[in-house]
């Protein structure tokens, strides 16, 4: 890690501690009883798990040591994931808060992540916000055996395939088409009031977009209702941040529910390298 990255860590630490987040430091390697996730055996045959996701690490730590307490932490360290046969280390800065009590908790996380990403990357950055409640509402009207197919097509914004599926199965997928069209052509928050959304979803998106536009007038805020299909635990408001100068995803996060408990978190992706 270079000097500029240390400056980013210090800047992030300053913002997080001002909001009451405590540091979270645990080893990336832990002894394991059985293979799970990313793991390896040392020369003596000891099995170790490798940290691949900070949210899971934080939740497991809380479950093990303080299951009934609130945890509100910031972190700065590597996660390890396989890309093909290569183990890749990615340095992340992030926040986690469990339990999540209100939308204000999510906006607090969003504020720190967006402010930091705006400073760390050349930009300008684009913040995309979505909501998993969109899928929950849409799927009520669709046969269960088609859920995964429809969700995959929403993922890829594939309007042509949605129209074909609607014709072949003789089911009305016009609301799905509208959600995809809105996510392609009507991404400005000003269109939220005319979108076909559950009231609670619309209110969350309006609150989050208004908050961001007021706090960060130079940041572009867009609505993408097709977000978050890749992380099953997401449940509620979600976001991604893109750096337009490098054309890459630089941060992501949102609300989640794990084992019936609500939380919120977000991560900034600083550095990736093959181990």
From Swiss-Prot:
Additional observations: This function is generally fulfilled by the C-terminal part of HisG, which is missing in some bacteria such as this one.
Entry GO MF terms: histidine-tRNA ligase activity
InterPro entries: aa-tRNA-synth_II/BPL/LPL, HisRS-like_core, HisRS/HisZ, HisZ
Compartmental location: Cytoplasm
Keyword Nucleotide-binding: no
Gene Ontology, cellular component aspect: cytoplasm
Protein's name in the database: ATP phosphoribosyltransferase regulatory subunit
Organism: Thermotoga maritima (strain ATCC 43589 / DSM 3109 / JCM 10099 / NBRC 100826 / MSB8)
Gene coding for it: hisZ
Top-level lineage group: Bacteria
